[in-house]
Amino acid sequence: MAIQAEEISALIKQQLEKFDTTLTVEEVGTVTYVGDGVARATGLANALAGELVEFANGTYGMAQNLESSEVGIIILGGFDDIREGDTVKRTGRIMEVPVGEQLIGRVVNALGQPIDGLGEIKTDKTRPVEVKAPGVMERKSVSEPLQTGIKAIDALVPIGRGQRELIIGDRKTGKTSLAIDTILNQKDQNMIVIYVAIGQKNSTVRAQVETLRQMGAMDYTIVVNAGPSEPAPMLYLAPYVGAAMGEEFMYNGKHVLIVYDDLSKQATAYRELSLILRRPPGREAYPGDVFYLHSRLLERAAKLSDELGGGSMTALPFIETQAGDVSAYIPTNVISITDGQVFLDADQFYAGVRPAIDAGTSVSRVGGDAQIKAMKKVAGTLRLDLASFRELESFAQFGSDLDSATQAKLARGRRTVEILKQPLNKPMPVQHQVVVLYALTHGYLDDVEVADIQRFQDELIAYVDANASELFKAIVETKNLPEEADLNAAIEAFKAGFAGSESAE
C-alpha cells in the first residue's frame, strides 16, 4: 500500500505540534569534600542560604555557608554513600516538613518521617522549617494559665499559654519527668503537645512514649526524635521542625505546648557543624551566632492576637547545667531569651525533695498574670516564705536557742516543703491544689506531723470530693475561691476525723 504525501506531511505536522521547546535548566555542582554530616561543593554560584540541594544518590542537603568559590552544605540524612566528585544540584526550594492533625499520636524523625512502624502519615500539608516569628502587633499579652499539674510550678512559678519558661538543672535532676507530668496534665485541656527529644537515648524516648501511650496522652501528642547516633544536622534541625508543626495548629487558633529536651545538645550539634564548616569559634568554641540559634527558635512561641485567631504556642526549653553553673554561656543566653526559669537543684533532689524546684532562683516573669484568682490568693507569699525558710534553715543549724516565731516559721516551712513534694506521673488538678494550699497557708497543717502531710493531703482531697464536691466545682467554674466559711468548715470537719500517727517530728 503506497503512503500518500499528504499523510506524511500531516504526521510530520502532528509531531511538530507535540514538540516541547521548553528547556529544564539545572544548576549542578561537584562535591569536593564530605564527612561528619557536612559536604562542600563548587559550581553552585547562585545557591541561596538555607536552600535545599539534592545529591546524586537522592539525599538532600541544606546550603549553609555561601563562599566565593564553594558552598558548605549540611547533609539531611546518611552521608556514607556520598563521594567526592559526585554531582549536587539546586532545587530552588527551602526545607519544609509535613504538618497537620495526621501527625498527632505519631513518632517522627527530624525530617517529619514516621519512625514508629505505624505506616506512612497521610498529610499533604507542609510548612517551612525556618519562618519569621510573629511581630509585636501580632501578639497578645499572656493571660490564660497553662496548668502543669505540678503544685510547685503552678503555685510558685506559674506558666501562661504563649510563655517561654526555661527548665534548667544538672543531669538526672528530674527535668524530663517534669515535662512528662506536664504533658499528662494536658488531657481534656484542649491542648496539643509536641515533645522534641534532642540527643536523648533511644531507649529513654521509647520508655517515655510508652508512658504517654499508657496514660492516653499520645492522643494529643506528637513526638519528634533526633537520637544521639544520628548526624549532627538532625539534632540541629529537630527543634525547628517541632516549632513548624506547632505553628500549623497555633495559626489555626489552637493551643500548643512544645517541649525541647534539651537545647544544650542542639547547641553542641550546631557547634560541631560550625567548626566543620570552618566558621570562626567564639566563647567555649561556640560560633558567634549561637544566641540567634536559640532566640529565633524561642521567639516563635507566642500568644497570637484575636485577629489571628488567638492561638498560642507555649515553649518549655530544657538546658542541662554542669555542677549547677547557670553562668555558663548557653544557660545565660537562654535565660535572657525566656520569660523565666524553673531551676532544679541537685542537692534537694538527692535529699528526697522531688520535684527539686529551687524557689529562690526560679522565677516566672509573665505567668503571674495568667494564674487563676483562687491560686493567686492561696499562693501569694508562698515563694518568698519558702525562700526565707531555706535561709532560716541553714542559719538554724548553728544554734538551738530560737524564739517561738522563728520556730513556727521553720515548722511551717518544713510542712510547705513536704506538701510541694509530688510522686511521678501523678499531676494534680488545679482545684485540688487550691484546697491543699489553702489548708497549708491557713495553718491547718501546723499541728499535723510532717510524716503525715502527704496522707493528710490525699485524704483531704478524697473527703472534699465525697462530701463537699461543690467546693471543687466552684473553683473550676468561677476560677475564684469559694466562700471561706464553707472551705474552713469542710477542712475542719475532715481534720476532726483525721488520725495522725503518734511519731514525733
UniProtKB/Swiss-Prot annotation:
Its EC number is 7.1.2.2. ATP binds at residues 169-176. Keywords: ATP synthesis, ATP-binding, Cell membrane, CF(1), Hydrogen ion transport, Ion transport, Membrane, Nucleotide-binding, Translocase, Transport. The keyword Transport applies. It is an enzyme of class 7 (translocase). Its main location: membrane. GO terms for cellular component: plasma membrane; proton-transporting ATP synthase complex. The record marks 362 as: Required for activity. Produces ATP from ADP in the presence of a proton gradient across the membrane. The alpha chain is a regulatory subunit. This is ATP synthase subunit alpha.
